[in-house]
Amino acid sequence: MNRINILNADTANKIAAGEVVERPSSVVKELVENSLDAGAKNITIEIQNGGESLIKIIDDGSGVHPEDVEKAFNPHATSKIKDTYDIFSINTLGFRGEALPSIASIARVDFKSKTEDFDMGKELIISGGEKESLTDCSMNRGTQIEVRNLFFNVPARKKFLKTTARESALINDLVNRISLANPDVSFKLFNNNKKILNTYGNGKLIDVIRTIYGKSTAENLIYFEEHKDTASVYGFIGNDTLARASRNNQSLFVNKRYVKNRSLTVAVENAFRSFNVTGKFPFFVLFIDTYPELIDVNIHPTKSEIKFKDERFIFKLVFDAVHSAMREYVKDTFTLPEEEEKKFEALKEEVIQESLDKEISTLEKLKENINYKVSDDKRKEEIYSYNPSKDYEAKTEVNIPVDFLSKENQEESSKFNNSLENNDFKEVSAKREISYDPILIKNELKDKVSENTYDSLESSDYKCNKNEYGNSLEERIYREAKFPKLKVIGQFNKTYILAEYDSTLYLIDQHAAHEKILFEKYSSDIAKKKVEIQPLMIPLVVTLPTEDYLYYDENKEIFEKAGFKISDFGDNSIRIEEVPYFLDKLNPTELIISMINNLKKMGTGETVEVKYNKIASMSCRAAVKANDVLSILEMENLIEDLRYINDPFHCPHGRPTIIKFTSYELDKKFKRIT
């Protein structure tokens, strides 16, 4: 039988070195992190033959006390921690005391260091773990270490090294990441005496990015930032022009430590794909600052992996920060013209100053001046006919659907409807939309023609005279239009709405646009717990596979808040009794199964909010489809609803809903200009 052996120090050190020092870039990482922990502001790295022949690090840090120079190369000797309690509040990059002895056991090391308090420094030479000399030396404050002939006594490890070019590239990439994490430190990297990198150390992250990735990259970045009590997130994400087929240009730092974390990478990518469906991976430089006791960096030999005490919280924080920045970036490309935006703001201020009662009173006074004209064969209603001033061309409108008024004002609306009935208008639709023009509000609210045909509204997939998103007069007033009011000029291929504004042609994907309107409406209703439900005439019993039932059972509360009334029916069966009102025409069985499948793909670690969004995305199935013929009025109302949602520019799957071509761009296409 095999007996238990006690390994000698040399063998033990080489085994430890195999965990810490995998390749030349591992040596660079450990030594540069030591320099940073020493407070260095200028760090120079020199390598030869991919680091195999020479790795040299020079810094201007605090240095090592002369009495500690030899001690620093003993296993588990460190200045970073003292006891077990310190492990749970680590503020330094290194702390185990393994790097220097591990490196010294597999290479020839020349170590020099000097502190501010001493006139002379100390030089220690170690080869293969054996001390050769310890002498005084003359040098400036800081540390200089040379590592030569790496793996000279471990041929098994040496033969697994990549080519010189590959090892050099890995070192270059590592120094780039460390430079990003420390913009206040100047880094210089030399490869075979050729300068590869030189950062300024001025504390500006964008300058480091420009130095490493180039001017073009720096000009296509979007800054994001989010702060909570226990953590902060900030950094840059590239727009779609910087997306690539690999994740090579993704950098994640936690307390300035470069780490890899699959969950947080997915959080950034999911936020990015909400606005881009390129199928590629985004460029990003992400920083997370949090309390040391809320993370564990001691789970991997190279400290390249990290665990969070509350990973769901961090996931949501990262997702929200990136998503919000991307949304604002996209919105900025469709900004309202300055003149129209000023008029909108002026209108909003005026509405704020006037009470709602006063506004309704003003409407009552105007009823006497309203002329109605109804065609019996078309059953059309013309409300508030007027001739606008010729001097006023560019108008900003705030649309106030009557059926979304408060209870008090609904009573006024009811009186208004009765007066219409008394005038023999029996076929007038109860669903009205009154459009207010800012100039006309100031001039006793002169009125604009609004037409609708009751029959066409009832039969259309898109209820064009009912605002899909707004819920009240106040909500309608305070929402901000995200792009100008467009003039519809037609429909192309029964799929795209053509519209124009200010010498610009807009193309709107009718399905994607309606998808996003429904998605935001449903998401808002879920958040406010105001989902309108529709009972099924005949409840459906669905038998699920065991795995699917377990996922349903785990997320019961989420389905309930999303507007589904489902009860257990025994033996992995469920009974579907009620569904959200606008999903009642869809197949409930397929709907529930699809939602469960979506939740399965997400796993159990996702936040409740993300799961709600995934369920809300199913509302897209109720949207108008491609090849659906829409009237001009239906298209106008769809666009009007789109203008006021939070993000009108992308559907829930990330596809664009609206694109534009300026007159200049079209002229160039037709070669009218060069």
From Swiss-Prot:
Q: List the CDD domains hit by this protein, alphabetically.
A: HATPase_MutL-MLH-PMS-like, MutL_Trans
What is a single molecular function from GO for this protein?
Answer: mismatched DNA binding
Tell me one Pfam family matched here: DNA_mis_repair
**Single GO biological process annotation from the record:** mismatch repair
* An example Gene Ontology CC term for this record: mismatch repair complex
The similarity comment for this entry is: Belongs to the DNA mismatch repair MutL/HexB family.
PANTHER family in the cross-refs: DNA MISMATCH REPAIR PROTEIN MLH, PMS, MUTL, DNA MISMATCH REPAIR PROTEIN MLH1
Name the UniProt record assigns to this protein: DNA mismatch repair protein MutL
- Organism this protein belongs to: Clostridium perfringens (strain SM101 / Type A)
